[in-house]
Every structure is written in structure tokens, then in C-alpha cells.
Amino acid sequence: MAITKVHARQIFDSRGNPTVEVEVTTDKGLFRAAVPSGASTGVHEALELRDGIKADYVGKGVLKAVENVNKTIAPALVAANLDVKNQKAVDDFLLKLDGTPNKSKLGANAILGVSLAVARAGAADKGVPLYQHLGELAGNKGPWILPVPSMNVLNGGSHAGNKLAMQEFMILPTGAKSFTEALKMGSEVYHALKSVIKAKYGQDACNVGDEGGFAPNIQDNKEGLELLNEAIAKAGYTGKVKIGMDVASSEFYKDGKYDLDFKNPNSDPSKWISGEELGQFYKEITSEYPIVSIEDPYDQDDFESWSKFRADMQDKIQIVGDDLTVTNPKRIAMAIEKKACNGLLLKVNQIGTVSESIQAALDAFNDGWGVMVSHRSGETEDTFIADLVVGLKSGQIKTGAPCRSERLAKYNQLLRIEEELGANATYAGENFRRPF
């Protein structure tokens, strides 16, 4: 089935910033997709095209990207008469049309919107659910796997105004028997955490950040881990709910050192620590707390520290590359060669097409890595990644706290998928790193 029309518009994301929405029309109907956007971005990511006009939307307008879809991509794609079921042919066509290594001509946000909408059209043309179509594109077939949600419930770093250097503290309900039960556990721990925070720091500490997590005035990282332990115990899930962290350490890497006081403009350089010292801290906390996954423990180009830490930990925990790998096959190949990590954070907008995202996951799986499909901090109500994580059978998704509708949209879609699959649904649980 060929495409008869492509149309883009500017809409708003969960932070009130403009983003791109694309509609692709075929004889089967109209298929829509919206593009997310990150706050802490890796320098190696594909280019998100913004207008940069300070007087309009604080420089964050995307009307140029929208125009690139409507005036360049749309007529070319309709004329090409490609079959929407052949995702790779469509994506290759888009890449050729752009012609740059980082999608800077048309914008990764323009290209991705089209790519996502085409995938939806392809599923409809085949008459199958989106997760099944995406799974088949990845060479998978059922039974399908429901992911462990990695819920960001405590915020620091660039996502919060407190002193916390590390960006996200997450809960993973690995001890649940189903995704439905996992969401119940996550929700109950989240509410227990809220009451613990309210008692310790007061009502105003219960405001939520971009991804629905709390950002109380925590002074150091261990204090955050203690809060999580307390909330997990209070909800009655000790042993069943584990902890994950996104350190986002590229945000506080300065002159070859790590500044855990980076939010203080008068931070003392003599207190900045080496990668080796930071590694000691990670070893300490992984022995004291039920931590199963650490994302971006080091700067995106500090390969030496990554490789040493992975060798030291001997795969006891998942070490996830995000800024390190940016869902880019070349960066993933480099990380595989240097044995830098054993997990990939998969963000479709870091690379910019569905086909390249699937290839990134396959490359990671081939080296025995785990793959965690992820949202961005600036999200929309689009639920594409919920279907993607099921189709890839990757067993883990990171899409925020059980709070804020743009986060719950993904979790609710996973509830629907689990219900639809019935007895054919398998929850990844404790096997979330290698579920199949």
C-alpha cells in the first residue's frame, strides 16, 4: 500500500515546547506520530532542527522542520510510491533525501515523525497490531514479552533544582508476575515515597519534575537511595522492587574529572573526583543497595573509565550506555569493541528512524547486551515506544514515574497489549536483561 499524503504540523510537548507531529495517509486511513525531545542530550545525537528565533517560542520553534516535511519530504515520498510495509525502503529513502551523517539538512525530528507514522501505516496495511509489525521488522515472532518498567521516581541532575548531581533514581518491579502487577507495585511504591518525602521535607517537596519524579532538597546521592529503600519497604515490596540509576555524568564532567557539586557556581575544583574514585563510589552503593542497573556512569567519551568499571563489576549489574551510545550503530560498535557497557538505552529520536533504531537494538542483542527502550524528558501522548519494546522483546522500558499523562500513556498502552495477548504474554521480570 502506497502513501497518498504526508502532512506535518507544530504541536507542543509535555514541557510546553514545540515539537513535530506527522500524519501519513494511505487507502487504509490516516496514521499519526509525534516526536519527543530530550533535556540532557548527547553530543553524538542526530540533529533536532529548531528554528532558533529567540522571539518565537524562546528559540525552540520547529516550523522549519515542519516545512521540510510538507515541502520536501511529502512530495518526494508520495511520488516514490513506496510500500508502507517496507519500513527499511522508506527510511533509506528519507536518509538519502537528507544526505547528511547526522540528519542536519531536514532535521532528525522531521525524518523521525514520518518514519514513525509510516510504521503505523505498515501495521494497519498488514492488519496486525503495531508491536507485531515492529517485531516482524526486527525478525521476531511471538510469544511477546512485556517489559519491566524502570520508573524514574526521584530526580536530580539537569532535571531538578536540588543539589543532587545524579539525574534519576528509578524503581524496577522485577519481582512481579505480570506487567499489570508491576505497575501496581510501582504505583504503590511511588505513593509510599510521596508520604515519606512529605514527612521528611514538607508538602512543597512533593512537586514533580519533567518525568513525574519527586525532587526534594536532597543533599547527597546516598540520601536518595535511602529514601527509595524506605519507600519500597513501606509499600511491602522489599526484595521484589529493585533500584536503577541514571547518573548522566556527562553533565558534570569537567577537565577530566567529575564534579558532584556541579550545580554550585563556586564548586571547589580540589573536590572534583577521578573516574577511578567515582567507580569506588558505585561499588560501594551497589553493595549497600539493591541496584541492578546504572546508566551513563561516566562521560560520553571517557571510554577508559567505562571499560575499567565494566571489567571490575563482571556483569553483576547492567551498565547502560545512553550519551555514550546515542542509539547510533557506529557508537554501539565502538562500545562493543572497547567492552564499555552491557546495556543500551534505545531512544528513537537519538538516531531518527525506526529501521536504524531496530538495527541498534539488534547490534546490542548480538553482543549479549540488555536493551532498555526509553522516552525523552520532553514527551507527547504518543505511545509508539510501548509497542516497540514489546516488538523488540527487550524486556525493559524507561518511561517515567506512574504520574503525568504523557508517561502513563505508554504504561496504559502496555496494559492494553498485555490484556490483548492474554496467556501469550510473558513478563520479563528478573530476566529483564536477557528475556529471550
Curated annotation (Swiss-Prot):
A biological process from GO: glycolytic process
Any one Pfam family match given in the protein's UniProt record, by short name: Enolase_N
Transmembrane segments: none
Pathway stated in the Swiss-Prot or TrEMBL entry: Carbohydrate degradation; glycolysis; pyruvate from D-glyceraldehyde 3-phosphate: step 4/5
Active-site annotation: 211, 347
E.C. number(s) listed in UniProt: 4.2.1.11
UniProt keywords, alphabetically: Cytoplasm, Glycolysis, Lyase, Magnesium, Metal-binding
Gene Ontology cellular component terms for the protein in this record: phosphopyruvate hydratase complex
Binding residues for substrate: 159, 168, 295, 322, 374-377, 398
Cofactor or coenzyme needed: Mg(2+)
Annotated Mg(2+) binding sites: 246, 295, 322
Catalytic activity reported: (2R)-2-phosphoglycerate = phosphoenolpyruvate + H2O
Principal location listed in the UniProt entry: cytoplasm
HAMAP family assigned to the protein according to its UniProt record, in alphabetical order: Enolase
Family under the similarity heading: Belongs to the enolase family.
Protein name listed in UniProt: Enolase
Annotated organism of origin: Neocallimastix frontalis (Rumen fungus)
Lineage, broadest ranks: Eukaryota, Fungi, Fungi incertae sedis, Chytridiomycota, Chytridiomycota incertae sedis
